[in-house]
Amino acid sequence: MVEFKGYALTDPSAWSTLDIVSFQPKNFLDDDVELAITHCGVCGSDVHTLSQGWGSTGTLPLVVGHEIVGIVTRVGKNVEEFKVGQRVGIGAQIGSCMKCKRCKNGNENYCNDGMIDTYNSYYPDGVFAQGGYSTAIRAHQQFVFTIPEAIESKDAASMFCAGLTVYAPLRRNGVRPGTKVGVMGIGGLGHYAVLFAAAMGAEVFAFTHSASKLEDAKKMGAKHVISTHDDDFYKPYVGELDILISTIDVFRPDRPLKTYLSMLEVHGKFINVGLPDSNNPLPEMHAFDLLGGAFLGGSHIGSKDDCNAMLQLAAEKNVKPWVEELPMSRAKEAVENVKAGKVRYRYVLTQDIAPVAGA
């Protein structure tokens, strides 16, 4: 029986302690691609899951990680896009039903009938899905992506969740040169939103509560950087923005959503992509708060088309995320620092359980 190895949560009371375990991969099918993992980004989702911020982890042991780069070691007989030895990536989704209207229309990331998350999920064959803090992974070819040569593996890794999560709503909402894009929160997601919006030619407004990040946001490409410490921070920007990407916890009662909406131009869009630990309802709003013509919405990762377009843009515009590499054996340090807000702006773990040929 084939076994992979990974750094896994085994005791929920010690959420950041990850031990090396062996686990069974999914059965290999005709549309599958197997890769030996070289890099895996550390996502906020990993921390929320490990620390049970989104609820009980359930099945243990659990290997997290869904910002994966690796080298193809095996392809199914239906796979033509990928070859053994090729460098590829995998993000937060590794399967869908591939039959529903959404899947057929290029919206497989919104599949309601067969969504399979990269970890903490189950394959149709009943095997528990383990993530990328590991030696290898298998996925349906629809959820595997070719990495352009111009993008280094350490830079590509976190694009497959954090990058895609903010790029997809920018692309799908028609951001182009001159579009006024606001980014609320300059963390792992927000820094990518600034980088990609700037690469798309947008006029970027970066909003952050951290004074230390104001200069960083400028270096990332923001034309305007705004501290949100002042309660009236939004007033100079009322009616100014075409789209506002929010990466923060807008569900906290002390964060007035209606003030964010007020910064939108008529028919401007507020897109929430932040998924905090809290399960609070939306802050109090009234029908009158929407009379400015604002649209309130969300977004979930991205499709294959979105991801390929993102990678092409990153290669063409030399988009460089701010990352720090650590060996996988230091995953404990990485997840603890992410939870404490100490990372600037993404960690990427490098393989140290088993060397990868061709890496």
Please give the residue ranges for each predicted region.
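C-terminal capping/lid region of NAD(P)-dependent oxidoreductase domains
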Residues: 2-4, 215, 238, 271, ...
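Glycine-rich beta-strand-centered segment in the early N-terminal region that forms part
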Residues: 24-40, 53-104, 146-150
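Short glycine-/small-residue-rich Rossmann-like dinucleotide-binding loops
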Residues: 41, 76, 93, 230, ...
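NAD(P)H dinucleotide-binding glycine-rich loop of Rossmann-like/cofactor-binding domains
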Residues: 97-184
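Adenosine-nucleotide cofactor-binding segment
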Residues: 177-186, 198-259
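N-terminal Rossmann-fold NAD(P) dinucleotide-binding loop
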Residues: 190-191
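Glycine-rich phosphate-binding loop and adjacent beta-alpha segment
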Residues: 248-325, 351-359
